[in-house]
Amino acid sequence: MTPEEEAHFRVLQAIAREPDITQRELAEQLGLSLGKTNFLINALLEKGAIKMESFRRSDTKLKKIAYLLTPSGISERVRLAQGYLIRKRLEYENLKAEIDALERDSIVASIQSGESKV
């Protein structure tokens, strides 16, 4: 999964959870700049993965925008999720192996120094 695909996946995930999220809220949630978030939204709109709908909230007179996943956006999200899961599982296994090695080294060092921290 490329960094761009991961960014698209994270945007699609956020929109699926909260369609009426603003770009500013999305940027904060994903830790991205507002400009980068706008770029990602526009790329997903161009790909046909999402569409925009405007509506009025009953408690205000302001128009709001909702981002909705299209059928191709849902398929894209599923495809990207599979790659994301594979990568995250691999990262988890590597991290777990590193933690296990550090714990073994720590136990060996404790035994060698005469401490018993087990």
Locate predicted features.
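Key DNA-contact positions within bacterial/archaeal DNA-binding proteins
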Residues: 24, 35
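Alpha-helical residues within the helix-turn-helix
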Residues: 28, 45-46
